[in-house]
Amino acid sequence: MKFRKWIGMLCATLMLCACTTKEPVKKEKKKVVSIPKPVLNTENVSAVVMDADTGKVYYAKNEQESRYPASTIKLLSALVAIDYYKDDDELTTRNIMSLPDRVFIHTAPVYDGERIPFKDVIHGMLLKSSNEMALTLAENYKGGYDGFIEAMNKRAKKIGCTKVDVSNPHGLSYADKGWLKETCSTKDMALIAKEFYKNKKLRKIISTESYVFESNPNREMKNVKMTHKDSTYYDKRVIGGKTGFTNLAGRCLVTYSKVKKRTIITVVFKENTRQETYTDTKKLLDYVNDLLAA
């Protein structure tokens, strides 16, 4: 009996020793990698970088400030138009001569009374940044021009925009035309771009490298320079985008890019030069690439 008790005590002691001498498992601390934010070319620039699928914001600077969006507002015009028109709808051009800036004026000018398929009109507005085509979308809309502008502002609010206030479909800003309230923050533009990218047709158009009007082969257009392999601004990550410029807005650029299998939206407003929009966009894409790789 004593022998059994002694054996039991010995076993218990050995087990206790084994437990106390076992080294605790050390948990490896996850290394925190600090990625420096890029220094952009212009101090007053407004910029946002957003994931097109999740809405996650990777970078923001002056993102809530109201700015003039120039022709980037045509992304919002496209959202309204794509829900109303069909590809084979023929639209009639009106009031073309009222535009102070006409992009087709030197190559195959647009005149009042032309009948142009919606497919040509939407491509012309997004790829050529044609103010004539933006005006045509508004003039043929239900409720006419004013109805289109109202629909743009309503759609912006529905998306969640808080600083959008548009008075025309093309983004021009002229005091004598009453076009000085055309405002939008870069945060709002990123939300518009995100909503835009959800639409399969618009996504295809914005990623088209070049397009020729079916109704007039002399009207040809190309996407932003960052998609052109022969351009000094070429970046293989960039799928497509929308440029913008007025004296009040400065240089603006919205792009869609693929970074680490994610679709990334970049928005820059109020740059001094076209070159700055491209170089800052590249810096922002490099920054997101480093963040996703960390």
Predicted features and spans:
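Bacterial N-terminal signal peptides that target proteins for export
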Residues: 1-7
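Hydrophobic face of alpha-helices
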Residues: 7-8, 149
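C-terminal motif of bacterial Sec signal peptides marking the signal peptidase cleavage site
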Residues: 17-18
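Short, conserved catalytic or interaction motifs in soluble domains
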Residues: 21
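Active-site-adjacent loops and short helices of periplasmic peptidoglycan-processing enzymes
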Residues: 24-187, 197
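Penicillin-recognizing serine hydrolase domain
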Residues: 31-44, 143-294
